[in-house]
C-alpha cells in the first residue's frame, strides 16, 4: 500500500517554506525557514561534480533571501561560477523526498466547485464583479454542500444552506471551506472565472482579510496572465492547487473538439448535458422565475465534472505526473518546468549539480520534421510502418546531451540531402569525425561516444520503466481474472497503468521542452540535431524500401512509398498482391502481407537502420520500425490528408474493416459535427460501394441538411483579432477573417437591439459558430456568427444560406476525395444515357 508520508503542496513566501502533506496518514502543514544549498567550484576532490566533470563544494549562504542576494552578487563575476537549483521549492522537495514519492491518492482532498451569479447589469466580469453570487455548489471528497440566495429543496445527500443576503452566503461558504481546506480545487473554467470572480466579489463584500481564509496560509496572490491576446486576472491560493478541468481536458485528451463548453464535452464523453433552461428567455428570467431548477442547474455542473473525472481520471493522471517529477500539481501544465525538475532530481541522485538558468534567445530557426509529397490518388493494399517513440530514441541513438556535445562548429557539409545523395564532401566529413570516434547527428553536430549523456540515459530509464509498469499491469490483470473480487488488484492495475502512461507522456514531451528557449538546457543545435536526424531516418528507409521493392518486383524507379511523415511510411503493395495473390480473398491477402512484413520487410528495415547507425557512428542503434496497418484501399488527397480501409492494425484483426482517417474534415473540429459524421459515412461507402450509391447518399443528406437548425450546420471557430479588425463606422475593417467579421456583426446587432443584458457579447478567444447568409438580410452582410445559439430576436434564421453551407462544409471536401477517385457528385449525362 502507499506510504503515509508525502507532500500535497509546497509554496514559498519570503524565507519560509509552506508545506502541506500527509504524515502518519494524517494531514499536516509546516511553516519553516529554509536554508537552500548552492555550489561553488572546488580545487579539492569532492563528492559533487558539474555536468562537465568539475568538482564543486556545497555552500549554504543562509536563508532564501540570502541565497538570492548571493547569486545576484556574483552573477557575471569572472571565474566565480555558482551552481545549483534556484527554484528553491523544488530543491526542498528533493531534500525531503530523495527517492520516489509513494503517495496515496485517496488521502488527497479534492474539491469541485461551480458558482452562478446574477446578470441584471449584463454578464459578470471578473475585473468588475458587480453581480451577486447567488448559488455555489461545492463538493469535497464526495460530499455536496449547496448554497443559495433563496429557498430551494434538494435530496438529503446534499447539505443545503438558504440565505436572504449574499454576505451571509459568502461568509458561510468561506467558514465551511476554512474548516477543511482542500488540497485541490477543480471545476470547468474555474481558473479564469469561478475562482477569480469569487475572490474579487468576496473582497468587495467581505473584505480582503476575510478572503485570505481561502488559503490555509492566509495568503492569496493575484497574477495577470495572457491568453488569446487578452489579459486575465487569476489567483494563486497558497497551499491549494487549482486544477481547472477544462485545462486538464485540453492538455491530456489529445483530441480537438469543436467546442470546449461543458455542455458539449459532457455530451461527447458522457452522453449527458447541462440542465436545459430553454423555457426561459434569459438566465435572469431563469433564476428569478424558477430558483429551485436554477440551483439544480448549478448542482448538475458539479456532478458532470465529477462524472468526467470518474471516466477520464485526468486528476489522477496529473498527480502521477507531478509526483513522478517531484513538482506541484499545477506544474504539470508546463513541459519546461516539469522536465527541468525531472532532470534536477535525476542528476541529484548521482551528486551532479545543475548549471544556473541563462536567458536563452531563440533567434535562430531550425528545421522541423520531414513530410513527403504524397502520391495523390487511390491505392490498393497499403501497409504502413512507424518508428517507435522517434525523438526520445534519436536522443539515445546519437547520445544527444549538453555535456556530450562536442564544443566545435557544426559541420555544414553534413546534411540529410548530402548523406542520402552519397556525395564525396559529406563522406569525407563523416570520416573525419568518425576518426575521432564522435557520434554524428544529421545537422553536423557531434557527440561523445565514450560516456552516455544524462538525457539519453534518462530517456532509456523512462522507456525501461514504462515497459516494466506495463508488464506489472498485465500481470495484475491476469491475476484479476482468477480473483475478480480482489480490490487490491484493482488499485494495483490503476496505479501501474497511471505510471506507464506518465512515462509515455514524459517521453513524448521531452522534445517540446528541449526545443523551448526558456528551458535550462535549450540549445538550438541539439534541437535541430533531433529533427534533422529524424528526417534522415525516415528518408533513409523510404529510399531503401523503394530500392528493395523495385528489385523484388522487377520494376524500375517506381515509387512504392505513397507518403511518409515524421515517423511513418505508407507503402503500396498492390503490385506484390497482383503477382502472388491472384484470386485470393481479402483475409488471405491480409495473412500473406502480415507474414511478408514480419519475415521479410521488418528484418530488411532492421538491417538498413543498422547500416545507417554505422554510417553515422551512432552511440547505439535505437531505430525500431514496426508494422502498423494493413489496408485493402487507401486514398490520398494531399500531405497528411488520407483515408485507409484497415483490416489489421498492429496485429489486431478486425471482423469488419475500420476506417483510419487523417486530416480530412471528418477529424477537424472546425467542421460541423453532423457533417463530420456524414463525411465518415460516405468515405466508408467510397471504400465499399460504387459511384451511384455515393450520388444517392449526397442527395439524401442534402434533404436532411436543409431541415437542420442553423446551430447544427454552422462552422465552429475560435476568434482572434476582435480589437484589431473592429471599426466603429463600418463594424469591421477590410481583410477581416470571416469568423471575426461575423462576430463583430453579431455584437453590433446585439447592442443595437438592446439585447446586451440577455446575450453575452463575443470576445477575443471565444469559440463561436458562423454561417453564410442570403442577401439582403437584417445584417446587410453575407455572414453572422454567434456564441452558442442564434438569437431569434435577430430575425436571421430565415436568411441562412443552406445551399452555400452544404457546398462549403460537405460537398467541397467530398469533391476533393472523389476527384482523385474519378467519381462525380451528381449524375452526368453522356451520349449513351441520352439515347438510352
Kindly label every feature range from the protein language model.
Residues 146-147, 156-160, 181, 195, ...:
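Active-site-proximal helix-loop-helix substrate-binding element of RNase H-like nuclease domains
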Residues 173-197:
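Proline-aspartate-enriched helix->loop->beta-strand connector
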Residues 281-403, 408-409, 485-544, 563, ...:
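Common nucleic-acid-contacting/processivity interface regions adjacent to the catalytic cores
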Amino acid at each position: 500500500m502507499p506510504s503515509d508520508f508525502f507532500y500535497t503542496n509546497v509554496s514559498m513566501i519570503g524565507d519560509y517554506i509552506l508545506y502541506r502533506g500527509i504524515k502518519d496518514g494524517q494531514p499536516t502543514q509546516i511553516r519553516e525557514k529554509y536554508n537552500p544549498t548552492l555550489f561553488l567550484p572546488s580545487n579539492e576532490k569532492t563528492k559533487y561534480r558539474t555536468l562537465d566533470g568539475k568538482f564543486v563544494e556545497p555552500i549554504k549562504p543562509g536563508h532564501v533571501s540570502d541565497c538570492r542576494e548571493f547569486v545576484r552578487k556574483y552573477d557575471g563575476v569572472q571565474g566565480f561560477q555558482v551552481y545549483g537549483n534556484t527554484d528553491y521549492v523544488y530543491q526542498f522537495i528533493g531534500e525531503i523526498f530523495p527517492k520516489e514519492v509513494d503517495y496515496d491518492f485517496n488521502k488527497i482532498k479534492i474539491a469541485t466547485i461551480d458558482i452562478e451569479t446574477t446578470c441584471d447589469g449584463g454578464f459578470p466580469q471578473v475585473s468588475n464583479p458587480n453581480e451577486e453570487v447567488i448559488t455555489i455548489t461545492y463538493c469535497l471528497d464526495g460530499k455536496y454542500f449547496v448554497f443559495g440566495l433563496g429557498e430551494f429543496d434538494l435530496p438529503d445527500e446534499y447539505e443545503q444552506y438558504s440565505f436572504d443576503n449574499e454576505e451571509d452566503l459568502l461568509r458561510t461558504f468561506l467558514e465551511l471551506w476554512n474548516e477543511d481546506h482542500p488540497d485541490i480545487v477543480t471545476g470547468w473554467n474555474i481558473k479564469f472565472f469561478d475562482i477569480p470572480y469569487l475572490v474579487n466579489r468576496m473582497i468587495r463584500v467581505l473584505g480582503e482579510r476575510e478572503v485570505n481564509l481561502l488559503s490555509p496560509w492566509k495568503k492569496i496572490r493575484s497574477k495577470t496572465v495572457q491568453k488569446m491576446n487578452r489579459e486575465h486576472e487569476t489567483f494563486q491560493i497558497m497551499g491549494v492547487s487549482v486544477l481547472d478541468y477544462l485545462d486538464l481536458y485540453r492538455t491530456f485528451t489529445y483530441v480537438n473538439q469543436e467546442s470546449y463548453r461543458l455542455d458539449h464535452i459532457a455530451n461527447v464523453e458522457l452522453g449527458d448535458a447541462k440542465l436545459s433552461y430553454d423555457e426561459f428567455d434569459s438566465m435572469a428570467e431563469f433564476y428569478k422565475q424558477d430558483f429551485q431548477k436554477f440551483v439544480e442547474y448549478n448542482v448538475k455542473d458539479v456532478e458532470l465534472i465529477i462524472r468526467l473525472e470518474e471516466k477520464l481520471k485526468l486528476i489522477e493522471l496529473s498527480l502521477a505526473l507531478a509526483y513522478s517529477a517531484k513538482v506541484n500539481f499545477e506544474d504539470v501544465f508546463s513541459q519546461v518546468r516539469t522536465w527541468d525538475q525531472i532532470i534536477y532530481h535525476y542528476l541529484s541522485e548521482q551528486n551532479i549539480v545543475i548549471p544556473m538558468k541563462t536567458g536563452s534567445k531563440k533567434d535562430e530557426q531550425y528545421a522541423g520534421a520531414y513530410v513527403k509529397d504524397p502520391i495523390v490518388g487511390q491505392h490498393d493494399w497499403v501497409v504502413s510502418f512507424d518508428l517507435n517513440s522517434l525523438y526520445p530514441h534519436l536522443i539515445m541513438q546519437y547520445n544527444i546531451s549538453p555535456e556530450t556535445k562536442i564544443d566545435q562548429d557544426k559541420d555544414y557539409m553534413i546534411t540529410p540531402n548530402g548523406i542520402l545523395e552519397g556525395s564525396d564532401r559529406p563522406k569525407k566529413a563523416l570520416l573525419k569525425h568518425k576518426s575521432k570516434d564522435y557520434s554524428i547527428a544529421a545537422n553536423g553536430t557531434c557527440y561523445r561516444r565514450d560516456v552516455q549523456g544524462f538525457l539519453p540515459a534518462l530517456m532509456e530509464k523512462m522507456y525501461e520503466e514504462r515497459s516494466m509498469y506495463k508488464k506489472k499491469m498485465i500481470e495484475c490483470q491476469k491475476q484479476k481474472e482468477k480473483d475478480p473480487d480482489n480490490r487490491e488488484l484493482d488499485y494495483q492495475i490503476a496505479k501501474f497503468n497511471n505510471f506507464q502512461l506518465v512515462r509515455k507522456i514524459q517521453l513524448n514531451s521531452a522534445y517540446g521542452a528541449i526545443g523551448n528557449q526558456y528551458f535550462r538546457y535549450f540549445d538550438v543545435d541539439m534541437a535541430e540535431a533531433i529533427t534533422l536526424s529524424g528526417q534522415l531516418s525516415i528518408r533513409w528507409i523510404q529510399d531503401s524500401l523503394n530500392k528493395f521493392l523495385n528489385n523484388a518486383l522487377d520494376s524500375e524507379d517506381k515509387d512504392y512509398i505513397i507518403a511518409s511523415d515524421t515517423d511513418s511510411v505508407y507503402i503500396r503493395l498492390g503490385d506484390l498482391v497482383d503477382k502472388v495473390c491472384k484470386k485470393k480473398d481479402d483475409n488471405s491477402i491480409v495473412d500473406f502481407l502480415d507474414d511478408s512484413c514480419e519475415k521479410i520487410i521488418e528484418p530488411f528495415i532492421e538491417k538498413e537502420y543498422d547500416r545507417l547507425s554505422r554510417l553515422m557512428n551512432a552511440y547505439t542503434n535505437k531505430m525500431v520500425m514496426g508494422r502498423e496497418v494493413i489496408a485493402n484501399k487507401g486514398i490520398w488527397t494531399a500531405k497528411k490528408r488520407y483515408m485507409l480501409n484497415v483490416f489489421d492494425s498492429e496485429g489486431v484483426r478486425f471482423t469488419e474493416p475500420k476506417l483510419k482517417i487523417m486530416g480530412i474534415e471528418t477529424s477537424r473540429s472546425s467542421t460541423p459535427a453532423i457533417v463530420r459524421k456524414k463525411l465518415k459515412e460516405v468515405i466508408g461507402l467510397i471504400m465499399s460501394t460504387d459511384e451511384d450509391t455515393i450520388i444517392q447518399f449526397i442527395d439524401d443528406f442534402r434533404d436532411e441538411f436543409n431541415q437542420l437548425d442553423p446551430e447544427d450546420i454552422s462552422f465552429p471557430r475560435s476568434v482572434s483579432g476582435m480589437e484589431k479588425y473592429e471599426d466603429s463606422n463600418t463594424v469591421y475593417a477590410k481583410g477581416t477573417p470571416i469568423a471575426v467579421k461575423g462576430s463583430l456583426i453579431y455584437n453590433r446587432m446585439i447592442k443595437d437591439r438592446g439585447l446586451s443584458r440577455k446575450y453575452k457579447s463575443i470576445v477575443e478567444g471565444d469559440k463561436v459558430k458562423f454561417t453564410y447568409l442570403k442577401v439582403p438580410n437584417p445584417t446587410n452582410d453575407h455572414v453572422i456568427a454567434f456564441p452558442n445559439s442564434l438569437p431569434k430576436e435577430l430575425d436571421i434564421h430565415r436568411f441562412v444560406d443552406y445551399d452555400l453551407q452544404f457546398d462549403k462544409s460537405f460537398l467541397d471536401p467530398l469533391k476533393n476525395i472523389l476527384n482523385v477517385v474519378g467519381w462525380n457528385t451528381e449524375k452526368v449525362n453522356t451520349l449513351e444515357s441520352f439515347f438510352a
